[in-house]
């Protein structure tokens, strides 16, 4: 009986030790995924030194001697603070969320692919002037520098949330930045569903004169100048 109890205690003790080791490893990886705002690092892609100063609210203030380095620093800071949001939003606009979240994301993926935002964003890059293109390229270079740093220094996954999902840190491109701006515009256009419903209703009306009933603007008889 004593031996049985000793065996049970050993199993329980071993399980506790193993659990503590696993928790310590997880904690270490999560801790490595949190950006270090106090460090000094050397990264490819900049001409002169950049300084990113964080205030008490961790808001970045970027100091650089030229515009390209400034946009580089902005991309780097965004990748430090918003990596999870940036990666998920890029998958959203590409219509690829179901690759990570499964079939429940199919409707949103289908909607995004119908809008074809990402292809339009790639075309939008070509339509930009040289100054804007350089800014987009420098911003993307800053993000990619952070990706390189994460992989080179084994900084976990770059964001704690990415430990839960196997999302690869693919290189960031100028089209990605434009695509996210277009996605934000779509999210801000919540009235589009009402516009579609109104258009379908107008098409279905048997009497064209009933259009006035659904118009957002009340159309009245023109006013003569002498009546103003």
Cite the ranges covered by each PLM segment:
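N-terminal type II signal-anchor transmembrane helix
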Residues: 3-43
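Substrate-recognition/specificity elements adjacent to catalytic centers across diverse enzyme folds
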Residues: 26-216, 220
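Positively charged, low-complexity/disordered segments
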Residues: 221-224, 228
């Amino acid at each position: 009986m004593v031996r049985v109890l000793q065996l049970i205690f050993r199993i329980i003790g071993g399980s506790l030790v193993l659990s503590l080791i696993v928790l310590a490893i997880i904690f270490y990886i999560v801790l490595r995924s949190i950006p270090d705002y106090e460090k000094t690092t050397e990264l490819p892609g900049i001409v002169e030194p950049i300084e990113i100063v964080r205030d008490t609210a961790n808001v970045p203030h970027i100091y650089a001697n030229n515009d390209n380095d400034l946009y580089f620093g902005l991309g780097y800071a965004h990748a430090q603070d918003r990596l999870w949001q940036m990666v998920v939003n890029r998958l959203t606009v590409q219509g690829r969320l179901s690759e990570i979240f499964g079939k429940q994301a199919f409707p949103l993926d289908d909607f995004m692919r119908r809008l074809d935002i990402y292809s339009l964003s790639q075309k939008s890059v070509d339509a930009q002037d040289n100054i804007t293109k350089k800014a987009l390229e420098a911003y993307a270079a800053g993000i990619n520098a952070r990706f390189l740093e994460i992989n080179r220094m084994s900084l976990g996954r770059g964001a704690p949330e990415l430990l839960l999902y196997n999302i690869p840190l693919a290189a960031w491109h100028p089209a990605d930045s434009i695509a996210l701006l277009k996605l934000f515009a779509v999210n801000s256009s919540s009235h589009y569903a009402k516009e579609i419903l109104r258009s379908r209703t107008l098409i279905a009306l048997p009497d064209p004169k009933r259009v006035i009933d659904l118009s957002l603007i009340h159309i009245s008889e023109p006013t003569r100048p002498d009546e103003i």
